[in-house]
């Protein structure tokens, strides 16, 4: 999806020569910071730490839907993130540098009388979190929906064996942005204008419908 949006942006900015290079998350982040790449996109969220290293267009490209992975036997009790907080459910740890950590921290700031216990940890993988929820050590795991689909829901997913015992509860959308090298201020401004035009003329909405079957912007207004 985001590549398709950036291809549409490229058509609006023919004064630049565009070369699209598939790469890993780490190489993208390091490459844009170092200048190896001018701009990058890969479901990137804006965080204070990233704003120190990169510049962002004002307009987002799309949104990542984020939510809770819970056991099916808890589905009658936990139907939303508010239910997790009300029941004092245990949320699996999140690495403090992970943007998902900020999602829960922001939720707790907005709900000071009904906080979720936010535990930080760096020594685990997605498979650990899924297993912990399955075993009952934790009641929920905060996960990006696309990751849940790729890791569990799809038939060829690596942890598809958990699919009949886990469910996904949507919480909200997090804006995703193009990431620009700090020296490329003019390019960032022009990309921002192009994204704004693509949203106004309906191009981005059409691409969201094509790739996701719905508009993701509605999820950005949820608190």
Predicted segment positions?
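Hydrophobic residues within well-ordered alpha-helices
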Residues: 9, 32-33, 68, 84, ...
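Ligand-binding cleft/hinge of the Venus flytrap
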Residues: 6-16, 98-123, 130, 152-158
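Extracytoplasmic small-molecule ligand-binding "clamshell" domains
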Residues: 1-44, 201
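Short helix-initiation/N-cap motifs at beta->coil->alpha
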Residues: 18-30, 76, 117-131, 135
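Flexible hinge/capping segments at coil-to-helix
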Residues: 71-92
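Periplasmic-binding protein-like
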Residues: 62-67, 99-103, 155-212, 214-223
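A ligand-binding cleft/hinge motif common to bilobed small-molecule-binding domains
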Residues: 27, 33, 41-53, 102-106, ...
């Amino acid at each position: 999806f985001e590549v398709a949006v950036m291809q549409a942006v490229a058509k609006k900015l023919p004064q630049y020569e565009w070369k699209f290079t598939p790469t890993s998350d780490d190489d993208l982040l390091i490459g844009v910071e170092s200048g190896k790449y001018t701009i990058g996109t890969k479901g990137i969220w804006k965080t204070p730490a990233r704003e120190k290293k990169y510049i962002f267009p004002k307009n987002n490209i799309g949104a990542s839907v984020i939510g809770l992975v819970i056991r099916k036997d808890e589905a009658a009790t936990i139907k939303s993130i508010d239910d997790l907080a009300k029941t004092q459910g245990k949320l699996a740890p999140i690495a403090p540098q992970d943007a998902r950590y900020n999602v829960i921290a922001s939720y707790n700031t907005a709900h000071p009388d009904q906080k979720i216990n936010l535990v930080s940890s760096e020594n685990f993988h997605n498979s650990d979190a899924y297993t912990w929820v399955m075993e009952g050590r934790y009641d929920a795991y905060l996960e990006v929906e696309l990751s849940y689909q790729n890791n569990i829901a799809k038939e060829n997913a690596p942890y598809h064996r958990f699919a009949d015992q886990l469910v996904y509860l949507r919480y909200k959308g997090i804006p995703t942005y193009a990431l620009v090298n700090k020296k490329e201020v003019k390019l960032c401004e022009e990309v921002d204008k192009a994204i704004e035009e693509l949203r106004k003329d309906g191009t981005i909405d059409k691409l969201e419908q094509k790739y996701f079957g719905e508009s993701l912007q509605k999820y950005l207004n949820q608190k």
